[in-house]
Amino acid sequence: MTKTAGLRGLGLLLLTSAACVGTAPPHAPPEAATSRDAATPPPPAVAPSPDGARALDVTREGGVPLVEVPPRWPAPGSRLMVPEVRFPAGFGKRRIYLDAGHGAEGNTGTRSVTCEDEEVFTLRAAEDLAQRLEATGHFTVRLSRKAGARVPYAQRLAEAERWGADVLVSLHSDSRGLAHTWSPAPGQECFRQDETPGFSVLWSEDATPPLQTRRALLARALARSMTRAGFLGYDGMDYTGLYAVDTAQAGVFVSREPTHRQIFVLRKPRIPSVIIETHHALDFEESARWREARTLETFAAAVAQGLVESFTVPKE
């Protein structure tokens, strides 16, 4: 998405604009030490676990045995569980139009904490996901663009409908909150904000009731599957005024007319469509995790299972 840190929940391609442009706040200086620092109690003792994670020591009072507290996504060592994808009898083969977000003329998306353009990440993630979905034998996938191509969004939607896609899934990475500048490498400067990790899935209510239902079902199934796999759903603290919380499923947010964002790939398709904001691109640890093969493998299996459930679970 074309988002600039410093604006809250900067999201996506709007119907009326190819890019959302904002300004970032000045570099946030380190907080000065205060007298409270001296009064801060020492952290609890820790003990290593067999897999290298650290565990809270609750023996300090009462002699209770050590209890491991596993690290939470996206901390190093936090575990993802690759779900088993189960296809019911008669599922057949479904057509998935997979949009690698951005990549239109003048629309490279946001820049990550390592100064990578969003369009580069989304194409890499979409190509990997497409291969894994195709490998199941139950999905035929068409990508919205190839490396170096500048494809308008209207052209993508027209192609998806001509091809007869069952659903449209658009991949993006998010940028949220108030970020500060930093240098990940000599000669580079971009934004960083490590406080709001997590994925989100977006859908629009701007549709007929039957299409609304199918969009909601798809978004909720994908978010539910990603959560089960160990991904953290974003709480939406920076989405106020942009999207509404979908109370049926954590990690899902709704664009409602006329007050919320009018996002082209959400409101225009006549087939179910969602955006998956895979992660917070300005979070250093989370961005690093999305370069791991295990993350991509888990994501693909979670998406596959979410798609299966959206096609087979009774409408909500």
Where are these regions (language model features)?
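Catalytic-site microenvironment of enzymes
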Residues: 3-13, 20-316
